[in-house]
């Protein structure tokens, strides 16, 4: 049995090449099974097409509105309280059509690792 751990994360939000802001809430090698981040997409912005290999993502919309495109499925409109499952390796992006920031939590299993991220844009 493992001991309970208290891990601290960097409290600073950062801007990504994907065109969204990320605040890592939990992502450590000590807990490889899961990571949690808060994502923020500014009004009018569409994130870059990308995949995350070997990682399942779940978005939980906190506030704002979004239009998600995953794989070849029709676009999905999202509002606060909605959940979105993104299978590992599926191309994806999200658009904020609203006038306020789109904020969502992103739960990754196993944890997000930069080496698994693939941009599909130039």
How does the language model describe each region?
Residues 37-53:
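Conserved short histidine dyad/triad with adjacent acidic residue
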Residues 1-34, 116-122:
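A short, N-terminal "cap"/entry segment at the start of jelly-roll beta-barrel domains
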Residues 22-24, 36-40, 58, 75, ...:
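Conserved hydrophobic/aromatic beta-strand scaffold that supports enzyme active sites
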Residues 46, 53-80, 90:
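A short beta-strand-loop-beta hairpin characteristic of the jelly-roll/cupin
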Residues 29, 43, 72, 109-111:
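Non-catalytic surface loops within mature trypsin-like serine protease
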Residues 40, 56, 119-122:
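Short intrinsically disordered coil segments
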Residues 30-31, 54, 73, 99-100:
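Short strand-connecting beta-turns/loops that link adjacent beta-strands
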Residues 67, 75, 80, 88-114:
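Ligand-binding loop in jelly-roll beta-barrel domains
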């Amino acid at each position: 049995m493992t001991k309970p751990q208290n891990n601290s994360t960097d409290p600073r939000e950062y801007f990504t090449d994907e065109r969204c802001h990320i605040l890592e809430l939990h992502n450590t090698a000590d807990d490889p099974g899961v990571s949690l981040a808060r994502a923020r997409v500014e009004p009018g912005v569409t994130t870059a097409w990308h995949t995350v290999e070997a990682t399942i993502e779940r978005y939980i919309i906190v506030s704002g509105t979004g239009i998600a495109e995953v794989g070849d499925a029709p676009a999905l409109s999202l509002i606060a309280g909605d959940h979105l499952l993104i299978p590992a390796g599926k191309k994806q992006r999200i658009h904020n059509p609203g006038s306020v920031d789109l904020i969502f939590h992103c739960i990754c299993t196993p944890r997000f690792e930069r080496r698994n991220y693939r941009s599909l844009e130039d």
